[in-house]
Curated annotation (Swiss-Prot):
Listed pathway(s): Metabolic intermediate biosynthesis; chorismate biosynthesis; chorismate from D-erythrose 4-phosphate and phosphoenolpyruvate: step 3/7
Site (described: Transition state stabilizer): R18
Pfam families: DHquinase_II
A Gene Ontology molecular function term of the record: 3-dehydroquinate dehydratase activity
Organism for this UniProt entry: Halorhodospira halophila (strain DSM 244 / SL1) (Ectothiorhodospira halophila (strain DSM 244 / SL1))
Protein name: 3-dehydroquinate dehydratase
Protein encoded by which gene: aroQ
Family: Belongs to the type-II 3-dehydroquinase family.
GO biological process, one term: quinate catabolic process
Keyword Iron on entry: no
E.C. code: 4.2.1.10
Chain positions recorded as substrate binding sites: N75, H81, D88, L102, S103, R112
Domain of life: Bacteria
Matches recorded under PANTHER family: CATABOLIC 3-DEHYDROQUINASE
Length: 148
């Protein structure tokens, strides 16, 4: 069974209560439930993790390569704009990935408009709220050869 890894960066564990006017009212669990339904219907195993710590996310990316993960959907959150380490981890495992952001980072502060990951991603989805995760999962499934 193909495997898709869903990774969430810092502060995303606060979804639903953190700035709901910007990030929406769905919780991280709500988003994962939606994606699990999409993946189950396509015969894809969904693995997921969230961490507020860069090193834990890097360790999870490294482990993904050893676990047979074929594709990653990642919302690196604030690490988007700061983490060379996350970039290097993704390059090291050479797994395709889609970068997702709930808010439109290009309509926000200047420091949020640079990503250390976008140029090495298969694609970037930004500003579509939780729907962005759905679109990313479906695109990843198709790229793994499945139907979504």
């Amino acid at each position: 069974m193909p495997k898709l890894l869903l990774l969430h960066g810092p502060n995303l564990n606060r979804l639903g209560t953190r700035e709901p006017e910007r990030y929406g009212r769905l919780t991280l669990q709500d988003i994962e439930t939606r994606l699990r339904s999409i993946c189950d219907a396509a015969g894809v195993q969904l693995c997921s993790a969230q961490s507020n710590h860069e090193g834990e996310l890097i360790d999870r990316i490294h482990a993904a390569a050893d676990e047979g993960v074929e594709f990653i959907v990642i919302n690196p959150a604030a690490l988007t704009h700061t983490s060379v380490g996350l970039r290097d981890a993704l390059l090291a495992v050479a797994l395709p990935f889609i970068e997702v952001h709930l808010s439109n980072v290009h309509a926000r502060e200047a420091f949020r408009q640079h990503s250390y990951l976008s140029d090495i991603a298969e694609g970037v989805i930004t500003g579509l709220g939780a729907d962005g995760y759905d679109f990313a999962a479906r695109a990843a499934i198709r790229r793994m050869g499945g139907q979504a």
